[in-house]
Amino acid sequence: MRAFMEPMDVGLKAQELSGKYENVVLSRTNDHVVRISRMTEPYFWHLHPDSDETFLGVEGVLILELEHQRIELGPGQMITVPKGTRHRTSPAGSHSINLTFERAEIETVRTDPPAL
């Protein structure tokens, strides 16, 4: 028997987020998840040795810092960070909200910041 399906309002889910950092699974697809994240301060430098990570901006501006590059991701913009790439994210203003597409059992390895 087929499961009952209903569309999800991502905008309403975004309004439910209020903490400094929240990262909530919205959906599962095979061995991947779609998460919605709200952040008000920078996340630590890290990498994922086993999975790419795709970000889709929903609200505000998400700053993606790589070793030699800084990218600003606005609502509706998307980027994929290849596995093994050291990076960190932070909001450009008071907060940012984004969707993240990644393996459900993604490994996160904390790293030192890149040398200046």
Positions of the model-derived regions?
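Residues that act as N-cap/strand-start positions at coil-to-secondary-structure junctions
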Residues: 20-21, 48, 81-83
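A cytosolic small-molecule/anion-sensing beta-strand core signal
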Residues: 30, 58-59, 74-75
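A short, N-terminal "cap"/entry segment at the start of jelly-roll beta-barrel domains
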Residues: 1-35, 114-116
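Glycine- and acidic-residue-biased ligand/ion/polar-headgroup-sensing regions
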Residues: 50-52, 56-62, 67-68
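Short acidic-glycine-tyrosine-enriched beta hairpin
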Residues: 68-83
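Conserved short histidine dyad/triad with adjacent acidic residue
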Residues: 33-49
